[in-house]
From Swiss-Prot, chains A, B:
GO terms for cellular component: cytoplasm. The active site is at T184. Pfam families: ArgJ. Catalyzes two activities which are involved in the cyclic version of arginine biosynthesis: the synthesis of N-acetylglutamate from glutamate and acetyl-CoA as the acetyl donor, and of ornithine by transacetylation between N(2)-acetylornithine and glutamate. This is Arginine biosynthesis bifunctional protein ArgJ. Its main location: cytoplasm. It comes from Deinococcus radiodurans (strain ATCC 13939 / DSM 20539 / JCM 16871 / CCUG 27074 / LMG 4051 / NBRC 15346 / NCIMB 9279 / VKM B-1422 / R1). It catalyses: N(2)-acetyl-L-ornithine + L-glutamate = N-acetyl-L-glutamate + L-ornithine; L-glutamate + acetyl-CoA = N-acetyl-L-glutamate + CoA + H(+). Heterotetramer of two alpha and two beta chains.
């Protein structure tokens, strides 16, 4: 996955287009689509928020139908959430417009919106933009990955090639990483592998739990968060196990990229939990550590304050045996049933790097889980203190 | 409750003492006790953390026995959490030492520790301090309220007098207010009202849910969080309903004081939820708003970003009907089933004050709930980025 980003192309049969339609006040690219020339098997997971946006609600309905997909249209700048019936109509109109230009069914197009909540889409700009989008279709992935960004400081791509030549290309966006109620996160994966939709959908929730949700924490919880994988089968039959393992690798790579690009972040925070009673408890404990403002602040200050790990694990509700619990910071054991003597200055020095890793053994079982976050900086506050006004 | 703080005394039959025992490196007061000359009926609630500290575990055992209390001993500076068997022994020794000097049973003394997690108590200092504490017993409440502080910037007291002359005096500490895994919070109330212990214990959980837990969010979740009320009956029979209402008022006052003194806080954040399906959902929605770093950052910047309220409510899982939902900021309606036109500059100006209030109607029922938090400032990060090293 070291190929220079500008050269990454979508898998065969997929093309994408991006443009500046004027939705973002900045004039940056804000409207984009990915189109498949063949029907796609697909899997999807959307936010569990009770105030989910129109795009999530509509996609979920299409998902339930089980019918194949042909395209995805995304706008950035306006989330079209909490916009009532008008918002639902606008969202459907955005999909219909692309379907019409592509001459596919409107139910073959899913949508995704991200940006400020509570504003209606500027439909004149959206519709005239969508009308011209397909003229720009090309194989390159970077323009799409860039057009879906909001407060992200860099585009997020990950890709892999399977043994039969099939490829998986993933893109993601999301930067407000401090908490589940963050700015919207998307993760999309496109593949020319041929996979059975039932098998894909059966495996997808567990993959999402270990990747996308391991940065969102507490499940999918913004109004617009979503992740989807589209498989058009152009590369022919693909070993399912190999495919799913590779898909998880791409999703995991994207999840880490999102965490590392958290608003105001200077370091990636990785928490690896072992010795848990179940994978769910391991993931829950790891996520609770990654979302803790106290631990995140400590990581920012390169402070090996492992007491905050103990506290966050306790808060997560995961079963622990404190007397058998172990904690390491950057590989240095600091707690084993009780405080250990260690060189705090040296550990602090080792934390002044791009990634800080806490290993935590709960001492009760054999399940494991990993989650990612970022440090909390003063910059986070200044980014978010004045976003709309 | 406007009496100058230095003049507040404990209810009759209670006296307190505080001293600097050398537990805090700063040399500030860090060891204190409250003693009742009569047996106290009591109620208690401790953290639900799975890594609860020794003091919480021991108090819970005493609570289960139902036997009366005579004293509370508190140290600040070291939380004595994640300290294993040695920590449990030290905690019991601290209680035993005070019981011995007071000539009461060791099971009549509860303990509370707050400060850095994972350090053992300096028992030589604690024990020699406890030995001399009772020499300093006096009626004033402020020295005790001050000695239990850690990162608090001010002491927290609230008191009320009932119609029969009985009084309730409450003290609290807690400042790391951004999240449930905050630094430890205590709230203690002392009263000379005579109340039935069974009735008190029956009513206490709901009062805690509406007050103490409405700032801690997600229940009691630090390793050492606790709240307790001690009633020694010296003022004689008291109307139970009047007492419970007054107790809730004192606890609510303390909860707001804790929120307003959040680390780095410049404003109190109050979220009042109505129209919920249940009180639990109303409280959950209000708390989720108060803990949202995005909303807290917006409050810091005086940004009426009500979209973050919609998002936080959605994340809380509370039942909502978005088309019937209403949001007001500082009394100005900004959302009613969809975005409303309002003077954003004027509302922003009105947020530049000590308390910012969001009113949120979920549009599904008639239950209500209120929660308190504070804004998120860059100062929070600097306070917490370098706490132990």
């Amino acid at each position: 996955m070291t190929e220079p980003l500008p050269d990454v192309t979508f898998p065969q049969g997929f093309r994408a287009a991006a443009m500046a339609a004027g939705i973002k006040p900045s004039g940056k690219p804000d409207l984009s689509c990915v189109v498949s020339e063949r029907d796609c098997a697909w899997a999807f997971a959307g936010t569990r928020s009770t105030t989910a946006a129109a795009c999530v609600t509509r996609n979920r309905e299409l998902y339930a139908s089980g019918a194949p997909l042909r395209a995805l249209v995304v706008n950035a700048g306006v989330a079209n959430a909490a916009t009532g019936q008008q918002g639902a109509r606008d969202n459907a109109d955005m999909a219909d417009a692309l379907a019409s230009v592509l001459a596919v069914g409107e139910a073959e197009v899913i949508t995704a919106s991200t940006g400020v909540i509570g504003h209606l889409l500027p439909m004149d700009k959206v519709l005239s933009g969508v009308e011209h989008l397909p003229e720009e279709l090309e194989g390159a992935a970077l323009p799409f990955a860039t057009a879906i960004m909001t407060t992200d400081t860099r585009s997020k791509l990950a890709h892999v090639t399977l043994s039969n030549g099939a490829r998986i290309v993933g893109t993601a966006k999301g930067s407000g990483m401090i908490h589940p109620d963050m700015a919207t996160m998307f993760a999309f994966a496109f593949t020319d592998a041929q996979v059975d939709q039932g098998a894909l959908r059966g495996a997808f929730p567990a993959i999402v739990a270990r990747t996308f949700n391991a940065v969102t924490v507490d499940g999918d919880t913004s109004t617009n968060d979503m992740t989807a994988v589209l498989a058009n089968g152009a590369a022919g039959e693909t070993d399912l196990t190999e495919f799913l393992t590779a898909l998880e690798g791409v999703m995991r790579d994207l999840a880490r990229q999102i965490a590392a690009d958290g608003e105001g972040a200077t370091r990636l925070l990785t928490v690896r939990v072992t010795g848990a009673a179940s994978e769910a408890e391991a993931l829950g404990a790891a996520r609770t550590c990654c979302v803790s403002p106290l631990l995140k602040s400590a990581v920012h200050g390169a402070d090996p304050n492992w007491g905050r790990v103990i506290m966050a694990v306790g808060r997560s509700g995961a079963g622990v045996k404190v007397e058998a619990m172990k904690v390491s910071v950057q590989g240095v054991p600091v707690f084993a049933g009780g405080p250990l003597n260690y060189d705090a200055a040296a550990v602090s020095q080792s934390m002044k790097t791009d990634e800080v890793i806490f290993d935590v053994d709960l001492g009760v079982g054999s399940a494991r889980g990993e989650a990612w976050g970022c440090d909390l900086s003063a910059e986070y506050v200044s980014i978010n203190a004045d976003y709309t006004t």
